[in-house]
Amino acid sequence: MKPSTEWWRYLAPLAVIAIIALIPVPAGLESHTWLYFAVFTGVIVGLILEPVPGAVVAMVGISIIAILSPWLLFSPEQLAQPGFKFTAKSLSWAVSGFSNSVIWLIFAAFMFGTGYEKTGLGRRIALILVKKMGHRTLFLGYAVMFSELILAPVTPSNSARGAGIIYPIIRNLPPLYQSQPNDSSSRSIGSYIMWMGIVADCVTSAIFLTAMAPNLLLIGLMKSASHATLSWGDWFLGMLPLSILLVLLVPWLAYVLYPPVLKSGDQVPRWAETELQAMGPLCSREKRMLGLIVGALVLWIFGGDYIDAAMVGYSVVALMLLLRIISWDDIVSNKAAWNVFFWLASLITLATGLNNTGFISWFGKLLAGSLSGYSPTMVMVALIVVFYLLRYFFASATAYTSALAPMMIAAALAMPEIPLPVFCLMVGAAIGLGSILTPYATGPSPIYYGSGYLPTADYWRLGAIFGLIFLVLLVITGLLWMPVVLL
């Protein structure tokens, strides 16, 4: 798209800010809170339209608020306090997100992913599974799922995991059986494999806290609004029954609902064997990487009472550098990690300001009036369903989470009977699972959709079917299991 045709992307956020700012301040809100909300909404619009990278949008929003903090961030009472220096306070607020433990946890997880890539361990694991399970098409589907499952805990970019590691491997498989893209032969085996690729990415994105950046953004938003949080182990245990069910069910379900013509063959295992021979035996760097990953996972699951999850990640990254699994240049040159680091920290800062100015509490009280008379369970389920279905309107999981999660959290806070940890975990699971609904919902979606093996009608049909199944199972496990382990 030419720059001359993109002007509206730049003007739209500014127009939204101006329109909201000109609306009379609602009853119960102070003027600075309403103006803050106007800028916050403009940032969300900017994240959706992306006239510039999302991190830049968020940083610009923070800069505007910090510079104009006497009118946007602080109340007249705060400004009148003796010794109150808005310049120092606004700077402290602007950089507060970078001290959040969630930021450092996801940054460490990105470095784990770099270690997987640099050592070749991630590719080796996927090839081993394909070799062992690739004789039958159904088992090949499970191999794709298990590959995603193993990589997901330490690969917080589902795009890097799905599009960068898994897709380059499985795209080589269909041609081995003369299953070609954009051809009648695509249904032979290619369509099933590609659908398994994207659906496995969505499922595993919901299973682990560190499997997808928006999961950690949600926890940051939750913490800034309520001071409650979910640990890595909380998320894992809360999702455990649903995780087991989906990992075992989805490959078979795809096999039944989108059956491949070819049921078995030996070409895929032979190809995987050739690739593994070319890689050679497991090297010392891969062994060290494997040991560190296992250690990190054990501490994340069982060590929460002794060491913070972010500190585990930070320490393991230090060991990765010391053991020369990755280099310092790998860290400073990791654009994806630094990009997420800045936009996630900035969005958490903005969400903190939304709470500090009183908007979240005001919005919660507003919702409390409209939700009174309904049971907490009914309200919780209705909110999850609405949140899930609104996924159709967003082409970015980050924008989706940034725009809707604060409102969902405010709604839950409006009814003390709603267990916030359970509700937020259901929201978090919906972010990943709901990504299956459309061919534009998350980073890997367009990659698999554009492979030539998934026709448009098939993608939308399967997305709706699997999306509905995921939603039903999420609600059931959310109501029956999550309260047992989280409350």
Swiss-Prot record:
This is L-tartrate/succinate antiporter. Belongs to the SLC13A/DASS transporter (TC 2.A.47) family. DIT1 subfamily. It comes from the Bacteria. Pfam families: Na_sulph_symp. Its main location: membrane. The chain crosses the membrane at residues 10-30, 33-53, 54-74, 93-113, 137-157, 189-209, 236-256, 292-312, 313-333, 340-360, 370-390, 393-413, 418-438, 465-485. It catalyses: (2R,3R)-tartrate(out) + succinate(in) = (2R,3R)-tartrate(in) + succinate(out). It comes from Shigella sonnei (strain Ss046). GO terms for cellular component: plasma membrane.
